[in-house]
A protein has these predicted regions:
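Internal transmembrane alpha-helix with an interfacial aromatic "cap," most often the third helix
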Residues: 19-25, 50-106, 120-122, 155, ...
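A loop-to-helix transmembrane entry motif
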Residues: 6, 106-109, 130-148, 164-171, ...
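Membrane-interface helix-boundary motifs at transmembrane edges
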Residues: 25-37, 93-105, 130-133, 156-168, ...
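Non-cytosolic membrane-interface motifs at loop->transmembrane helix junctions
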Residues: 2-5, 64-76, 129-142, 191-201
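Alpha-helical transmembrane segments in multipass membrane proteins, preferentially the mid-helix core
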Residues: 16-26, 87-93, 118-124, 142-168, ...
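Terminal transmembrane helical module of multi-pass membrane proteins
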Residues: 171-217
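Alpha-helical transmembrane segments of multi-pass integral membrane proteins
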Residues: 39-53, 74-91, 103-124, 140-151, ...
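Hydrophobic transmembrane alpha-helical segments in integral membrane proteins
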Residues: 1-18
Length: 224
């Protein structure tokens, strides 16, 4: 039953995010925030597919333990694409609120992203095994969490300052995604059921993409 639920949900998620991303790319002009957000959604969906597709195959066949290599490789790729996702989201923030300068902020975003990716590339992560070390799971997610916190603060203050109704909950979608993701990192190996928290975490990302898609439709409607 769990295999069916997860597989159906993952298919729905990937199709939804990729479809919305492509529609935003096609429905916006080059260099705009929505073109960037569309690219961000495609990166999100494409990156997650490297993990979710083998996971669905594993759940529906011989089990997760027999798919250590493809699952590990998928997690590895997803860890990098998720970092790129937040870098792109930072630039969405800059474009939406017409931010100029802020060189130190940009350096911080790139520094945290670089540290995160370097940590993800370390062999100590043992990505291609069934037992990845918890210590390295925590280490590689520290700069990722700091990057997420930075983006949360930026969107919260900017949306409030500009009274941006369309993006007023963007910060909350990121809070929820990290809130559901953290227990999975810490305790999923102890209690596999905790891994089910990835479903609401994924829903938070769908909400992130929907916020931008709905904002694009609203703005396009005003211009027509």
């Amino acid at each position: 039953m769990r295999a069916i639920i997860e597989t159906v949900f993952d298919i729905f998620y990937l199709v939804t995010v990729l479809t919305l991303g492509i529609r935003m790319i096609r429905g916006s002009k080059a260099g705009t925030q929505f073109r960037l957000f569309g690219l961000m959604a495609v990166v999100l969906g494409a990156g997650d597919s490297f993990h979710l597709v083998p996971r669905a195959l594993a759940l529906c066949t011989t089990g997760l333990e027999n798919y250590a290599v493809p699952l590990g490789l998928g997690k590895w790729i997803t860890s990098v694409t998720m970092t790129v996702f937040y870098v792109l989201l930072y630039y969405v923030w800059r474009k939406r609120y017409q931010i100029e300068g802020q060189k130190d902020l940009t350096i911080a975003v790139y520094a945290l992203s670089a540290v995160r990716i370097v940590l993800c590339m370390m062999p100590q992560n043992q990505w291609l095994t069934n037992h990845t070390p918890l210590t390295w799971g925590i280490l590689r997610n520290i700069p990722f969490a700091l990057l997420g916190l930075l983006i949360i603060v930026l969107f919260y203050h900017s949306a409030k300052e500009h009274r941006d109704q369309a993006f007023r909950w963007m910060w909350l979608t990121i809070v929820l995604s990290f809130g559901f993701y953290t227990p999975v990192v810490l305790w999923a190996d102890v209690n596999p059921l905790i891994g089910m928290l990835m479903i609401p975490k994924t829903c938070a990302y769908v909400w992130t993409v929907l916020i931008s898609y709905n904002a694009m439709k609203a703005e396009n409607g005003k211009n027509n």
